[in-house]
């Protein structure tokens, strides 16, 4: 799953590994998915239009989330992110 936009590819769903596609994810499916998924930093109008054109809005709402994970922590290194999800 990309921690920036909450996109999950099939490989990441099976492994449960968190990543941030823009800077540390080696999974090409995740990187490709994140390029087309709405980013949280976009204005609301951009997010709404992207959600309509790329995938159903229900799919975004039903994405699996880690309840204990912090929401978009920019200070974690890739190793810290992996360590958190390997506990």
From Swiss-Prot:
Lineage of source species: Viruses, Riboviria, Orthornavirae, Kitrinoviricota, Alsuviricetes
Source organism superkingdom: Viruses
Membrane topology type: Lipid-anchor
Name recorded for this polypeptide: Protein ORF3
Role, per record: Small multifunctional phosphoprotein involved in virion morphogenesis, egress and counteracting host innate immunity.
GO cellular component, one term: virion component
Post-translational modification: Palmitoylated in the N-terminus.
Keyword annotations: Host cell membrane, Host cytoplasm, Host cytoskeleton, Host endoplasmic reticulum, Host membrane, Lipoprotein, Membrane, Virion
Residue numbers spanned by region Disordered: 58-87
Sequence motif: PTAP/PSAP motif, positions: 67-70
Protein family per UniProt: Belongs to the hepevirus ORF3 protein family.
Comment block on domains: The PSAP motif is necessary for the release of membrane-wrapped virions from infected cells.
Source organism (scientific name): Avian hepatitis E virus (isolate Chicken/California/Meng) (AHEV)
